[in-house]
C-alpha cells in the first residue's frame, strides 16, 4: 500500500477554505498527480484540506473524497497561559538553544510534557493506527504487522501538524525532529510505502518527501509554507 500525503493549499484560516493562491496551488498539485494511480481519496474534515483533495480527485473522474476527523490540524499551546508556540517554532527554538531534537524521550521533556500538542499528537497517532489496522497493518511495538494484502494507493490531504504527527509516529521519530526537518509546504507531496508479505513485520519507507516543485512558479518563496 502507498499513501500520498498532501498538505492543503494556501489557506484562509478564518473561513477554513483556500485563498485564490491556494486554489492555484491545489490545481497545480492535481495536475502533478493526474497520472498517478490513486484508488481512494481521503482528507481531514477541515475545509481547506477537503477542498485541496477535491481538486485532485476531480482529475481522477470526480472520485469521492472521504473525510477523516482524526486528521484535522493538531492543537498547540499551554493551557492557562499565553504560550501558543507553534510546533515548528518550538523545534527551531530547541535547535537554537542546543537542545536535542532527536531525544527519544521527547514526550517527557518539559517543552512538550505540558503542551497541548502532546495530547493532540497522541490522539492523532492512536487514531492513525486504528485506521491502518482497518487497512491491513496492525501496530506492534514500533512496527506494523501485515494482516492482509493491500496494494491500494491512497491520497490523504491534511495539514502540516497532523501529517507530521502521523509520520513521526509511523517512523518512530521524535515529533520535534520531523517538524524541524520536514516542514511541509503548501500542497507538498510526501509518499510513504507500506510493503510486505502477509504476516510480516514491517516499517514504512519514504518514497518522496515534501515535494513542492509544482507550486514554485506560482508565487514568491515566502508563500510556500507560511
Predicted regions and their residues:
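Extreme N-terminal starter segment of soluble prokaryotic enzymes
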Residues: 1-4
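Short, well-ordered beta-to-alpha junction loops that form the rim of enzyme active sites
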Residues: 45-46, 70, 148-161
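Short catalytic helix/loop segments, enriched in acidic residues and glycine
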Residues: 18-33
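Acidic, low-complexity terminal tails and accessory targeting/binding regions
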Residues: 62, 74-90, 138, 142-153, ...
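Extended, charge-rich low-complexity interaction segments
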Residues: 95-112, 213-226
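Active-site metal-binding loops of divalent metal-dependent hydrolases
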Residues: 9, 46, 160, 210-212
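Phosphate-coordination/substrate-recognition cap region in phosphate-metabolizing enzymes
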Residues: 30-106
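Internal catalytic-core helix/loop-beta-alpha segment
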Residues: 107-143
Amino acid at each position: 500500500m502507498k499513501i500520498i500525503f498532501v498538505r492543503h493549499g494556501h489557506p484562509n484560516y478564518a473561513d477554513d477554505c483556500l485563498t485564490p493562491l491556494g486554489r492555484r496551488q491545489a490545481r497545480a498539485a492535481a495536475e502533478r498527480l493526474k497520472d498517478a494511480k490513486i484508488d481512494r481519496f481521503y482528507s481531514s474534515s477541515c475545509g481547506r484540506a477537503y477542498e485541496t483533495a477535491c481538486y485532485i480527485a476531480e482529475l481522477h473522474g470526480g472520485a469521492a473524497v472521504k473525510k477523516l476527523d482524526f486528521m484535522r490540524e493538531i492543537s498547540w499551546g499551554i493551557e492557562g497561559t499565553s504560550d501558543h508556540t507553534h510546533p515548528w517554532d518550538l523545534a527551531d527554538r530547541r535547535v537554537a538553544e542546543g537542545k536535542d531534537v532527536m531525544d527519544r524521550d521527547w514526550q517527557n521533556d518539559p517543552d512538550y510534557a505540558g503542551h497541548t500538542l502532546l495530547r493532540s499528537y497522541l490522539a492523532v497517532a492512536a487514531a492513525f493506527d486504528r485506521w491502518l489496522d482497518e487497512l491491513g497493518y496492525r501496530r506492534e511495538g514500533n512496527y506494523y504487522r501485515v494482516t492482509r494484502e493491500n496494494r491500494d494507493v491512497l491520497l490523504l490531504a491534511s495539514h502540516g501538524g497532523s501529517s507530521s504527527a502521523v509520520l513521526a509516529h509511523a517512523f518512530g521519530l521524535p515529533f520535534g525532529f520531523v517538524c524541524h526537518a520536514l516542514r511541509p509546504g503548501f500542497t507538498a507531496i510526501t509518499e510513504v510505502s507500506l510493503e510486505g508479505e502477509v504476516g510480516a513485520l514491517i516499517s514504512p519507507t519514504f518514497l518522496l518527501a515534501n515535494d513542492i516543485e509544482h507550486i514554485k512558479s506560482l508565487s514568491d518563496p515566502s508563500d510556500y509554507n507560511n
